Amino acid sequence: MAKEILFNIDARDQLKKGVDALANAVKVTLGPKGRNVIIEKKFGAPHITKDGVTVAKEIELADAYQNTGAQLVKEVASKTGDDAGDGTTTATVLAQAIVAEGLKNVTAGASPMDIKRGIDKAVAKVVESIKAQAETVGDNYDKIEQVATVSANNDPVIGKLIADAMRKVSKDGVITIEEAKGTDTTIGVVEGMQFDRGYLSAYFVTNTEKMECEMEKPYILIYDKKISNLKDFLPILEPAVQTGRPLLVIAEDVDSEALTTLVVNRLRSQLKICAVKAPGFGDRRKEMLEDIAILTGGVVISEEKGLKLEQATIEMLGTADKVTVSKDYTTIVNGAGVKENIKERCDQIKAQIVATKSDYDREKLQERLAKLSGGVAVLYVGAASEVEMKEKKDRVDDALRATRAAIEEGIIPGGGVAYIRAIDSLEGMKGDNADETTGIGIIKRAIEEPLREIVANAGKEGAVVVQKVREGKGDFGYNARTDVYENLHAAGVVDPAKVARVALENAASIAGMFLTTECVIVEKKEDKPEMPMGAPGMGGMGGMM
């Protein structure tokens, strides 16, 4: 396919038009008084959002050069969202500011490479300043609530829900978001270990009202193969039944013949038993069975360990205070495992989380960690309409991810103030040459931009507020929601340090690429010939007979 090529100033100008088109659409959402953006959908209701990355992802421009510029900034927003969970709009605003300032200097004849070096040096200095300003969150759930509230577009209800969810399942616990049936937003907590496998036969049910099998102080047999005949199973089944305690069987599968025998015994002699399939697949199944064994103080009966089912003894069975098995889920509460062993297993999983490169694997490992260490909280998001539901879920997701970022690297004063305080660290900083120093100056000017934009969206004059905030010290800043200058930390206006850091690093990275671009190649649009209305001379076919 033929290509079009554009060089030098013309190339950068076209790219910048694309950057501005996308950034101007995204930045209206910044700050507590930021506005919503309505996105048309081909099917269904339009999507209303105040989430920067959602807006960015929807933008495709008709002009190929401009669209390339827009895609560059879209990358900033997406990467910041992936890395820090929030700060997508801030990153977009910073990228636009660095590009605009940098382009003026490059057009005036400055060396793009030297400017990029100056930008990189300044960013490293600002990141140091942000880290120095950060205050750890620890177990202070009030601070967690503040971060969640700000990230959820200043919705105190969502902030409180996330803090409550973290209280219930600890900071490392898994919190998932689901749609509620009604209009209320609530928390549900699944205590203990729950996995998504239910009973193999409805005849195991003990509570017909809830259609659940409930067991108090059961023995738990964990087997990693299929139970195909009852002969191998009897040596452990008989002594377990004689104790009078219920028995939960977790196996890869139970053959229909063996299952029928268990069901018949359950019905005739009130044998307290329930069989479920093992959770997961492949290697993950082995790991999850090992987790269950450690949690319940049992042993996985596996031929890999040299153990056969017929050799199993009562000592190899796990136990727990309570087990509930429904059609789809099995929940084990208060397993009788040794605390030290459980902690050791948790540490092992944490090490795997750090080492893994795959997001999917990391998510699954975090789920396993939560199930071992405390449980899973579910945030049921309720709303009056589907449109509101989508918007609210976006905000809850933002808030949850920002809260995790805050726990990781601490919190800083919000409202763009941390960047303003970082300007002092750039005072008097010089590069190796004049153009590098210009690059440092570009960052110095650009990091004012998030505050200017927050103020502009609140209907005030940015330059005036920036000057007043610069004159203050520490946490003193402008609270756009209440239109008051105050101590932002005390007022609960805080941001995760990680979000501010990642937003600036990603914005500077893409802007640096942009400024050092000398040529843009895009596909040439080919005019498609219109389809002919009909072949000539085909009319008047009446006399064919």
Swiss-Prot record:
Its main location: cytoplasm. Signal peptide: none annotated. GO terms for cellular component: GroEL-GroES complex. ATP binds at T29, L30, G31, P32, K50, D86, G87, T88, T89, T90, G415, D495. Keywords: ATP-binding, Chaperone, Cytoplasm, Isomerase, Nucleotide-binding. GO terms for biological process: chaperone cofactor-dependent protein refolding; protein refolding; response to heat. Its EC number is 5.6.1.7. Pfam families: Cpn60_TCP1. Coiled coil: none annotated. It comes from the Bacteria. It catalyses: ATP + H2O + a folded polypeptide = ADP + phosphate + an unfolded polypeptide. It is found in: Cytoplasm. GO terms for molecular function: ATP binding; ATP-dependent protein folding chaperone; isomerase activity; unfolded protein binding. Belongs to the chaperonin (HSP60) family. Forms a cylinder of 14 subunits composed of two heptameric rings stacked back-to-back. Interacts with the co-chaperonin GroES. HAMAP family: CH60. Together with its co-chaperonin GroES, plays an essential role in assisting protein folding. The GroEL-GroES system forms a nano-cage that allows encapsulation of the non-native substrate proteins and provides a physical environment optimized to promote and accelerate protein folding. This is Chaperonin GroEL. It comes from Bacteroides thetaiotaomicron (strain ATCC 29148 / DSM 2079 / JCM 5827 / CCUG 10774 / NCTC 10582 / VPI-5482 / E50).
